[in-house]
From Swiss-Prot:
Protein name per the record: Interferon gamma
Lineage: Eukaryota, Metazoa, Chordata, Craniata, Vertebrata
Keyword Glycoprotein: yes
Annotated glycosylation sites: 48, 120
Source organism, top-level taxon: Eukaryota
Amino acid sequence: MKYTSYILAFQLCIVLGSLGCYCQDPYVREAENLKKYFNAGDPDVADNGTLFLDILRNWKEESDRKIMQSQIVSFYFKLFKNFKDDQRIQKSVETIKEDINVKFFNSNKKKRDDFEKLTNYSVTDSNVQRKAVHELIQVMAELSPAAKIGKRKRSQMFRGRRASQ
């Protein structure tokens, strides 16, 4: 009886161990492929610290982290765009972009498309510059948390008056 339990436990360990190998996120395998392609496993890559990891560790609040993550995701999209025609890493790039879509954009295609549109604007294009400056005051107002709170208080105040009338 005891031996049967040990055998079943051993088989369970083997099954769970093998599932760990096969259930690994596809992006990990593809990221390893990109590491080989870019020689990112070489020791000199660690010189002068990390690009992104220290920055992410510095920010604990979710909203702050999202800001930093959006810049990092933007960087990766630009990096991948530079190598979109390289057939040797095409599958890896597409797999990782799809995983970013799921993790960062919650599979929301509209959110991803708008994000990519923002990252593709050229700051050297005079028409883009003119439009950006034209919209600057409204964008700054949207950035201000005080403006949002004031709007919310006014709308709650009006709702309260309507309910009491």
